[in-house]
Amino acid sequence: MPSLKDLKNRIESVKSTRKITKAMQMVAAAKLRRAQEAAEQSRPYTERFNAVMAGLAASVGGSDSAPKLLSGTGSDKVQLLIVMTSERGLCGGFNTNIAKLARAHAQKLQGEGKDVKILTVGKKGRDQLKRDLGSLFIGHVDLTEIKRVSYVDAQGIAKDVLNRFDVGEFDVATIFYAKFVNVVSQIPTAQQIIPAKFEQQEGEEASTLFDYEPDEEAILADLLPRGVATQIFSALLENGASEQGARMSAMDNATRNAGEMIENLTIEFNRSRQAVITNELIEIISGAEAL
């Protein structure tokens, strides 16, 4: 049975931890508001850009002159997985869920006889995947010093990926991230970005509403690299909001659990102190009776 001093020390320790988790929850809440706004503001642009690109792609998809970023290499033998996670922990199952989805996809591809390569963005995913898939790593993007991701950061990642594609390092590229829904819901998502896939929105007829100059093929060749960067940027923003939402939820749970633990320890402390006082009274009474 722990002594009163031990129980008191544990109570103080848990109280100190609760202060930390509460502070982290408040910081995450503030960051979440900014990250959520950024993610939501980017969605209309991304959706409209994808709609226009879908119309262009539909008009030249079967053409022999279609850009390689759209038509592909003619093979899907070598697959590049771009796994986006956070640089910091204490965000519940956020990183684990993304890594789990990427790991399952990699194992599925390997089972089909495909060659898999992995590029990680964020050290938490790298640390989780390197245990069993480390031999597949071809690079890592460190975002530790970046407080708020920008389109320039996405362009840097896209440039590296496109350079690897141009020299024939892979045939298909897929990004893994968490799509933000709300504070308690972030959906691990896999999205192919090379060869480019643009879904035509219902009711959109971009290819018939506009005439393009000089022509669709030339415009696609110019816009497709930007499309890859846009999809990566959108994924980074969704990931940022998801990370802060997951951290806020995790710290809220930790704070409530700490409160419950303090209550239980306080009850145990009071019972132990009561037992000590009772024993002392019994000893005093017994001594008085002996006299």
UniProtKB/Swiss-Prot annotation:
GO cellular component: plasma membrane; proton-transporting ATP synthase complex
Domain of life: Bacteria
Topology with respect to the bilayer: Peripheral membrane protein
Oligomer and partners: F-type ATPases have 2 components, CF(1) - the catalytic core - and CF(0) - the membrane proton channel. CF(1) has five subunits: alpha(3), beta(3), gamma(1), delta(1), epsilon(1). CF(0) has three main subunits: a, b and c.
Organism: Roseobacter denitrificans (strain ATCC 33942 / OCh 114)
Compartments it resides in: Cell inner membrane
UniProt xrefs under NCBIfam families: ATPsyn_F1gamma, PRK05621.1-4
Protein name per its UniProtKB record: ATP synthase gamma chain
Main location group: membrane
Alphabetized Pfam families for the sequence: ATP-synt (PF00231)
MF-aspect GO terms: ATP binding; proton-transporting ATP synthase activity, rotational mechanism
GO biological process: one example: proton motive force-driven plasma membrane ATP synthesis
Record function comment: Produces ATP from ADP in the presence of a proton gradient across the membrane. The gamma chain is believed to be important in regulating ATPase activity and the flow of protons through the CF(0) complex.
InterPro entries: ATP_synth_F1_ATPase_gsu (IPR035968), ATP_synth_F1_gsu (IPR000131), ATP_synth_F1_gsu_CS (IPR023632)
